[in-house]
């Protein structure tokens, strides 16, 4: 299984994703600049955190129009795993690959800390190594992480089991229904504000994010 880590101008978590997958998990990974237009030969695509295009207009709004996005859309349509963390989540909503939107934190401040999450759905490509209802801790670092959707869309997300992670002890940004991460209806596209790639080694003080990447790899092995 080969992973593409997309590099947008302003990405700053691309190296973290690469290291989590390649160094820690031993996966086959390559960087792909957003100016490229093809993802041929890749089996999964990862959209990193950061500040693509300086978050001008809106977080993720300009990145949505880069050359690589049509190929990412095709990967999603083909049922291949597509993952976005933080700014990657914002880009996925801007591209219409995930419902809802991410708006400014209720505090109007940048929030950087570790938060407790609840695994709301472990029946996905990304969460099979977790237990439903399990509490985990992951870092967050964002100013525009408050998930919003209109009431009808929000109800549909809930009814379909698309909520994968929820904030548990506290809601750090005002996200509706304490939502921290969601999938598309098909379940092969995941966006989340927390950073699992920053919690994959004991040296970092936490390994709760490691099982997300192992879940993807295990899914590939099962399919093979």
UniProtKB/Swiss-Prot annotation:
Its EC number is 6.3.5.3, 3.5.1.2. InterPro entries: Class_I_gatase-like (IPR029062), PRibForGlyAmidine_synth_PurQ (IPR010075). It catalyses: N(2)-formyl-N(1)-(5-phospho-beta-D-ribosyl)glycinamide + L-glutamine + ATP + H2O = 2-formamido-N(1)-(5-O-phospho-beta-D-ribosyl)acetamidine + L-glutamate + ADP + phosphate + H(+); L-glutamine + H2O = L-glutamate + NH4(+). GO terms for biological process: 'de novo' IMP biosynthetic process. One of its GO terms (molecular function) is glutaminase activity. The keyword Nucleotide-binding applies. SMART domains: GATase_5. Residues 2-224 form the Glutamine amidotransferase type-1 domain. Signal peptide: none annotated. Keywords: ATP-binding, Cytoplasm, Glutamine amidotransferase, Hydrolase, Ligase, Nucleotide-binding, Purine biosynthesis. The keyword Phosphoprotein does not apply. The active site is at 86 (nucleophile), 195, 197. Pfam families: GATase_5. Disulfide bonds: none annotated. Part of the phosphoribosylformylglycinamidine synthase complex involved in the purines biosynthetic pathway. Catalyzes the ATP-dependent conversion of formylglycinamide ribonucleotide (FGAR) and glutamine to yield formylglycinamidine ribonucleotide (FGAM) and glutamate. The FGAM synthase complex is composed of three subunits. PurQ produces an ammonia molecule by converting glutamine to glutamate. PurL transfers the ammonia molecule to FGAR to form FGAM in an ATP-dependent manner. Part of the FGAM synthase complex composed of 1 PurL, 1 PurQ and 2 PurS subunits. This is Phosphoribosylformylglycinamidine synthase subunit PurQ.
């Amino acid at each position: 299984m080969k992973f593409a880590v997309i590099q947008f101008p302003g990405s700053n978590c691309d190296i973290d994703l690469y290291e989590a997958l390649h160094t820690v998990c031993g996966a086959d990974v390559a960087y792909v600049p957003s100016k490229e237009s093809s993802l041929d030969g890749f089996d999964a695509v990862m959209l990193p955190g950061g500040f693509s295009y300086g978050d001008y207009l809106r977080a993720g709004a300009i990145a949505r129009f880069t050359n690589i996005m049509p190929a990412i859309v095709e990967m999603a349509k083909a049922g291949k795993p597509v993952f976005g963390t933080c700014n990657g989540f914002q880009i996925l909503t801007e591209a219409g690959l995930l419902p809802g939107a991410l708006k400014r934190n209720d505090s109007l401040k940048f929030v950087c800390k570790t938060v407790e999450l609840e695994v709301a759905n472990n029946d996905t490509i990304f969460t099979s190594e977790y237990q439903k209802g399990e509490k985990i801790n992951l870092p967050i670092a964002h100013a525009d992480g408050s998930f919003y959707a209109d009431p009808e869309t929000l109800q549909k997300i809930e009814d379909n089991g698309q909520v994968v992670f929820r904030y548990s002890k506290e809601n750090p940004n005002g996200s509706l229904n304490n939502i921290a991460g969601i999938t598309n209806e098909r379940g092969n596209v995941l966006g989340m504000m927390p950073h699992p790639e920053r919690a994959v080694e004991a040296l970092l003080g936490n390994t709760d994010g490691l099982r997300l990447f192992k879940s993807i790899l295990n899914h590939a092995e099962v399919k093979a």
